Amino acid sequence: LTPKSILEFLNKDGNILLALSGKASTSSAVSSLLLEIDIHLSNDRSSVVVDHFNYDTVSAAEKHDVLLLQRPGPLRPDVKAFFDGEGILALPRVAPQTLGSDSALVAPILRAPATAYAYNPKEEMPSAEDIEGTGSQLNVVSAMQARNSARFTVLGSVEALEDQWFSASVKAPGGKKTPTVNREFAKQLTAWTFKETGVLKVGKIEHHLATEGEVATEDLNPKIYRIKNETVRNSDSQSHACSITNCSV
């Protein structure tokens, strides 16, 4: 697959879930593809997110590269939350993403905590110059909804989808062991990406000239209107017409 063929798939209303890993360098082809939609990886494409305060003490006692995060809420109070809920997510070896400022079509789903930072783990003792980004400027999960409503979601931790993390028990520093909710979050993420949620499903549509009183059946849905006609349009919908950043509650 080439970036061109994947973009052509998106242009034909295809939806994509891309999972990355900080365990290995991301290919230049994937990096180039993400640049096309204004999602940026680290310069060396090998960075991983670590957090010395929000990590799993069971599996990452030394490297602190298994993030423990709450599920995300809505971006704004007037936006529907598709990924919220109770419980802790375990996200091993996250490949961080940052978003460009030129596109209103991309949005963060899950940001890194304020105490997190990204660096190349090949550097044993990272200096300030080695740090690729910090805090909420780093995205763990990002998404793009194109103008044709095609959806592209980037998950920074493919390991988070493995069976072992669906049924794992994790423990934050100073906390108690708790089961992960990776399975539930994966269902939410795939449901949004592949348009099982957040899609307007229009049923019955009626339109007619604006008049007082009852409208006769034969006056519904006329084929022609004049320029200055006032009209009324009614439709039945089953859901919201939603992107991540634009969905009324």
Where do the PLM segments sit?
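Short, surface-exposed patches at the edges or C-terminal ends of soluble domains, predominantly
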Residues: 1-249
